[in-house]
């Protein structure tokens, strides 16, 4: 695309527009600059609320993929790609899932996480190649993340995913974007022009983070990774998380700290099993079997441990 063509295309994007409410921001004292930013940030959850039905549709497809042993794969560039990698990296410690269950792919590879590699996003073939290298299957879900909705790396990834037969989801902050037209499900929270024109790490990035939080959290809840509102499948890999695991056993069973620690020791720090053993009196192997029959849903295993 020529420079003139690119400029014309950017002129049409909401996310590249100039914000009339911040035209004088360079003249303001610090506290008023912050108020302007804060006022604009208030618009983000409102925009996300408007696309909850589309987010729910994506969650349902992700749950189906997880139930088949398949994956959720984020594809993005720049800030969008980093947010995908961040969300993916939080899933194993939070929900005790394998590292390859949720994957974040970013244009430019790992180096792009710590330094700008803006040119890496311009080749659609690289998006397709990244998915080829991880062995994309028809059972996987691929989410393309791009504020503009026109990033070539993301477009290439989504087009390849469509060829493979995987479910495709687009997350952009512009209505009727290119990637929205490609994907099976389009999530487009329109947050309006940024405080600083085109700085989409601001409101747009915040909107993306909120949506990604919802997608993985709701999907993990739907496959039994929580009990009540507790992260009972977390991996207690440091002192803080060990303390959190102990508290969860205490909170759900009413036992003492010593009893909770003993139950966690018996179950090799498996919070779900520790809770089930404490509540039902089952031995560890019987509790493990009951949890398996319940499909990993702790509430179901507690209500009928002999099912």
UniProtKB/Swiss-Prot annotation:
Q: What residues make up the catalytic site? A: 90, 121
Q: What's an example of a GO molecular-function annotation for this chain?
A: carbon-oxygen lyase activity
Q: State one Pfam family annotation.
A: GKRP-like_C
The cross-references to PROSITE patterns, in alphabetical order and at most eight, read:
GCKR (PS01272), SIS (PS51464)
Q: By its UniProt entry, which Gene3D superfamilies does this protein fall under? A: 1.10.8.1080, Glucose-6-phosphate isomerase like protein, domain 1
User: Where would I find the SIS domain in this sequence?
Assistant: 62-225
Key words of the record: Carbohydrate metabolism, Lyase
**Enzyme class at the top of the EC tree:** lyase
Look up the domain of life of the source. Answer: Bacteria
Query: What residue ranges are annotated as transmembrane?
Result: none
GO term, biological process aspect, one: 1,6-anhydro-N-acetyl-beta-muramic acid catabolic process
Functional description taken from the UniProt entry = Specifically catalyzes the cleavage of the D-lactyl ether substituent of MurNAc 6-phosphate, producing GlcNAc 6-phosphate and D-lactate. Together with AnmK, is also required for the utilization of anhydro-N-acetylmuramic acid (anhMurNAc) either imported from the medium or derived from its own cell wall murein, and thus plays a role in cell wall recycling.
Q: How does it assemble?
A: Homodimer.
Q: What is this protein called?
A: N-acetylmuramic acid 6-phosphate etherase
């Amino acid at each position: 695309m020529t420079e003139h063509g690119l400029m014309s295309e950017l002129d049409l994007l909401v996310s590249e527009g100039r914000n009339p409410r911040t035209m004088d921001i360079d003249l303001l004292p610090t506290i008023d600059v912050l108020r302007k930013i804060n006022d604009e940030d208030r618009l983000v959850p409102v925009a996300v609320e408007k696309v909850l039905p589309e987010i729910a549709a994506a969650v349902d497809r992700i749950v189906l993929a997880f139930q088949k042993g398949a994956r959720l794969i984020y594809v993005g560039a720049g800030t969008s790609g980093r947010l995908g990698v961040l969300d993916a990296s939080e899933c194993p410690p939070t929900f005790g899932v394998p590292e390859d269950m949720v994957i974040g792919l970013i244009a430019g590879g790992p180096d792009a996480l710590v330094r700008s590699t803006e040119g890496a996003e311009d080749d659609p073939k690289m998006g397709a190649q990244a998915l080829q290298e991880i062995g994309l299957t028809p059972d996987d879900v691929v989410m393309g993340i791009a504020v503009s909705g026109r990033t070539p790396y993301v477009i290439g990834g989504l087009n390849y995913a469509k060829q493979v037969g995987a479910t495709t989801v687009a997350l952009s902050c512009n209505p009727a974007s290119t990637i929205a037209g490609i994907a099976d499900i389009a999530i487009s929270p329109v947050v309006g022009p940024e405080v600083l024109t085109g700085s989409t790490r601001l409101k747009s990035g915040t909107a993306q983070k909120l949506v990604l939080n919802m997608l993985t959290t709701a999907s993990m809840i739907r496959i039994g990774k929580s009990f009540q509102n507790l992260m009972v499948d977390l991996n207690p890999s440091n002192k803080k998380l060990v303390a959190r695991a102990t508290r969860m056993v205490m909170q759900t069973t009413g036992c003492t700290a010593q009893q909770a620690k003993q139950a966690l020791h018996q179950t090799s720090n498996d919070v779900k099993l520790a809770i089930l053993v404490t509540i039902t009196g089952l031995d560890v192997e019987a509790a493990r079997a009951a949890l398996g029959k319940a499909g990993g849903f702790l509430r179901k295993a507690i209500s009928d441990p002999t099912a």
